[in-house]
Amino acid sequence: MEKALFRNLASRQVYILLAFANGQYRPIGNPFYFDGKDIHPYVADTSKCYSTELYRKYPLSERIRNYMGGIKDGHFEAACDKDFKNAELLCTVKDTPGINYNHVILEKPVRGRYARFCSSAEGYAEVAEMHFYKGEEEIVPIDSWGDAPATANTFAYQVYDNEPLSYFISSKPGASVTVDFGKVVTIDNFMYMPRNDDNFVRIGDCYELFYWGEGCWNSLGKKMAEKPFLPYDGIPSGALLYLHDSTRGEEELIFHMEDGKQVFVSDCKD
């Protein structure tokens, strides 16, 4: 068997060999991960398939994880009075969220005209989205305001503009961002979203999952996201995967599944 020697390859990368003939490149063999010493090939076994749930199309960086942690130890509350003197606690965010959409169902309905997120004494009021509901009907605010916006381009209404990349952030800790419903309403559930990179599965977007096999990318089908994750069946064991959002965005990266979790190249350990 003929061999080729490649020098100075960067470690912790995925590679595939290509042959050039008749003016075109064609893949040879399977893609593989190089850890700096050994290679680990991705071989799709279509005789052994599994089902899973996908939550992201791009790795979650430490920077974004820290942004998401900005909401930790804060709490949501509602009140009939603007000063929140008799506020009712809706929930406390006890840990850094692991996903973008965080749905809270209240033990009992709460009445109030105003709702707000309050950061901890050490944290900044930093929220991408917060939406309040009675049943499945959203209660849309008529007004909003926040304590000490951090920049001239930071507005309280951005917490209900349905744009995950926009957010409110205060310039001081122990602050809050408030929405006004215009009248006393009944809230029995709500959704909050921490500041994030919008690379989580986004409800309403159309996605397509691919696996590498037989020298090309093979589609496992298109799906419209109805929840914060995409359920997929028939995924070949050992395959290299790629999730494409055909609705929006550019950041996407190959990954494989390990112990039921997505592992992107940047997540791989030597």
Regions found by a protein language model. Give the residues of each.
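Short Pro-Gly-centered beta-turn/loop motif in secreted/extracellular proteins
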Residues: 2-14
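Disordered, acidic Ser/Thr/Pro-rich linker "stalks" and the adjacent N-terminal cap
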Residues: 12-15, 19-101, 105-110, 123-189, ...
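Short coil/turn segments at the loop-to-beta-strand junctions that recur within blades
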Residues: 225-228
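Short beta-strand segments and strand-loop junctions that repeat across beta-rich extracellular domains
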Residues: 74-83, 205-216, 239-243
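Noncatalytic modules at the cell exterior or secretory-pathway interfaces
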Residues: 11-14, 108-119, 233-247
